[in-house]
Regions:
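ATP/NTP phosphate-donor binding region
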Residues: 1-86, 341
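Gly/Pro-rich interdomain helix-loop hinge
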Residues: 271, 275, 279-360, 403
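Glycine/threonine-rich beta-strand-loop-alpha-helix active-site module
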Residues: 70-176
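Short, amphipathic C-terminal "tail helix"
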Residues: 359-405
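Flexible, glycine/charged-enriched surface loops at secondary-structure junctions
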Residues: 204-213, 228-238, 253-258, 276-279, ...
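Carboxylate- and glycine-rich phosphate/diphosphate-binding segment that chelates Mg2+/Mn2+
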Residues: 147-253
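Glycine-rich phosphate/pyrophosphate-binding beta-alpha loops
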Residues: 139, 244-282, 375-379
Length: 405
């Protein structure tokens, strides 16, 4: 028996933030990140709407990009002290992901982070609080998903928390918030969304309910992302919807090894100057993984359907896969995203020599490959890689070499 889970309510369109007025409760804690929600006035509006709904409001701010286990624990302590019955997570993927993990710890103070990471092993939530997610970026779609990504910096590993229990009760998808994104963030979150949709469509867990969401999201992203990046605000608004559709798809169809690799490389080289930003990692790895997965006939055929829907041409599935890969690489060029780790600069832009030295990459490769194979997203990938194949695939992603295995 399969399951399809979405938030109970999804408010969308310009001005949807006002839906906070309709929430019923006594106390709400707002979890936010680095200040953009405050800078552009959205945090003040959220506080005002919640107070209008009759709630006492507390703010937990300063959640960092790629949130840490320590931040999760601090936030949970704040919740335990304040005792909210609504958790309002506001911003990009990081504050929403962090707030989801805080929610688990708030409901179950004795639970460990290791227990949280057991796939679909979270006990029932909502005994203390409900959850509302408000997205300000157009990529992660965590406002509608059963996933959260938390980084253990002591190990240099990002861990996915996966359970339908952490699907928000209410999602607010207001494009006004997304219009404030800086250009680089538009690129990275947009390619994250494209990866979500493509991986969901070829996942072994895809179904009739997820396929339409995934394929339509792909077409919308094809039509809207580059123009959104170049400043078209109508396309920016449309991308906010497209990424949400992709999120609905992958939350129920699951993902694949593009995400497994992104999770396990993202913080693996932080001691050498920077993270590999999640959306940029997905963008670099997606063409290589398509080439790898397409050795499986079923996956190849489904990539062919994607190419057809995008109008890319091709006389057979082999040609269609090649054209899809070519298209995605061109999209990376248009978005100023490098093609491989070797050319990934500390600021995420293409550079002759990136921040990850070759000898460091090769030294850490076996462990990264092992961790990627063990990632929660690997199980639904259409082709299961061996340790040797994962190491070879990661090398292709480092050097930008052909995937011929």
């Amino acid at each position: 028996m399969a399951r399809f889970t979405l938030p109970r309510d999804l408010y969308h369109g310009k001005g949807a933030l006002e839906a906070l007025k309709s929430l019923t409760g006594k106390k709400a804690i707002i979890c936010v990140g680095g200040g953009s929600m405050k800078k552009f006035g959205f945090l003040d509006r959220a506080v005002s709407y919640l107070k209008e709904a009759g709630m006492e409001v507390q703010i937990f701010e300063g959640i960092e990009p790629d949130p840490s286990v320590e931040t999760v624990m601090r936030g949970a302590e704040a919740m335990l002290a304040f005792e909210p019955d609504w958790i309002i997570a506001m911003g990009g993927g990081s504050p929403i992901d962090a707030a989801k993990a805080m929610w688990i710890k708030y409901e179950y103070p004795e639970i460990t982070f290791e227990d949280m990471c057991k796939v679909f092993g979270i006990p029932p939530l909502r005994k203390k609080a409900h959850f509302c997610a408000i997205s300000s970026t157009s990529g992660t779609a965590t406002e509608v998903t059963a996933f959260s990504i938390i980084t253990d910096y002591s190990k240099g590993i990002k861990y996915p928390i996966a359970d339908f229990e952490i699907t928000p009760d209410v999602a607010i998808v207001d494009p006004d918030l997304a219009e404030t994104m800086p250009k680089k963030l538009v690129a990275h979150t947009g390619m994250d969304a494209m990866t979500h949709a493509i991986e969901a469509y070829v996942s072994t867990a895809h179904c009739d309910y997820t396929d339409p969401l995934a394929i339509f999201a792909i077409k919308m992203i094809q039509n809207d992302l580059v123009e959104s990046y170049n400043g078209d605000m109508a396309k920016r608004d449309s991308m906010h919807n497209a990424q949400c559709l992709a999120g609905m798809a992958f939350s129920n169809a699951l993902l694949g090894i593009v995400h497994s690799m992104a999770h396990k490389t993202g913080a693996a080289f932080a001691d050498y100057g920077a993270h590999i930003i999640h959306g940029a990692a997905n963008a670099m790895y997606l063409p290589k993984v398509i080439a790898f997965n397409a050795k499986d006939p079923t996956a190849k055929a489904r990539y062919g359907v994607i190419a057809d829907y995008m109008g890319l041409g091709g006389a057979n599935d082999d040609e269609k896969v090649e054209l899809l890969i070519k298209y995605l690489r061109k999209m990376n060029d248009d978005l100023n995203i490098p093609h491989c780790i070797q050319h990934y600069g500390a600021d995420s832009y293409p550079t002759e020599q990136g921040f990850v030295p070759e000898e460091v990459f090769l030294e850490r490769l076996p462990e990264i490959a092992k961790n990627a194979i063990g990632d929660a997203c690997t199980g639904s990938n259409p082709r299961q890689p061996s340790q040797e194949e994962m190491e070879k695939l990661l090398k292709c992603c480092y050097y930008d070499t052909e995937v011929d295995f």
